[in-house]
């Protein structure tokens, strides 16, 4: 009943899960990458693969609501080692997930059509250099 009172704008970026992607594009980019299992940073990695493929529409829909059960696949496992997905993403793509979402996906901004390549600004370059330095010191 209260769910209908929630009102968000369509936004740039992605809900991250679930995704609506054609089977051809899914197969072309290889779907989710196993190195991110059980899911930490698997969505940004998938979105980066889509970006590299030339996809520029990443749209979160206002009237689409998802309840995330939160770590349901790992919550009850004993001796579970948490995936270091953010580190894996940094090593794989040379930038943090936060940088990718901010500068490429423009996450959480109002949807206004297909995305463009990031604007190369002083702030962008400093942020990217910071990612590269962080990558060097990340194990």
Regions found by a protein language model. Give the residues of each.
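Hydrophobic residues within well-ordered alpha-helices
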Residues: 50-51
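Active-site donor/metal-binding and catalytic loop motifs
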Residues: 37, 59-78, 88
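A recurrent flexible, glycine/aromatic-enriched loop bordering the glycosyltransferase active site
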Residues: 2-24, 28, 76
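Acidic donor-binding loop at a coil-to-helix junction in glycosyltransferase catalytic cores
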Residues: 39-45
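Conserved donor NDP-sugar-binding/catalytic core segment of glycosyltransferases
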Residues: 1, 36, 56
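Short, hydrophobic alpha-helical packing/hinge segments within bilobed ligand-binding/sensory domains
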Residues: 17, 46-47
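Active-site phosphate/pyrophosphate-handling residues
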Residues: 24, 45, 88
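Non-catalytic, C-terminal membrane-associated alpha-helical segments of glycosyltransferases
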Residues: 80-84, 99-139
């Amino acid at each position: 009943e209260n769910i209908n009172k929630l009102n968000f704008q369509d936004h740039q970026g992605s809900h991250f899960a679930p995704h609506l992607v054609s089977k051809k594009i899914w197969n072309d980019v290889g779907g989710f990458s196993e190195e991110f299992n059980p899911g930490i940073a698997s969505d940004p990695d998938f979105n980066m693969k889509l970006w590299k493929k030339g996809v520029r529409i990443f749209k979160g829909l206002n009237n689409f609501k998802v309840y995330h059960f939160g770590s349901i696949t790992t919550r009850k496992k004993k001796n579970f080692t948490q995936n270091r997905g953010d580190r894996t993403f940094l090593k794989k793509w040379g930038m943090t997930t936060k940088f990718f979402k901010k500068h490429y996906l423009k996450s959480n901004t109002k949807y206004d059509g297909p995305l463009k390549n990031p604007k190369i600004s002083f702030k962008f370059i400093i942020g990217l250099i910071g990612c590269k330095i962080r990558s060097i010191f990340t194990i």
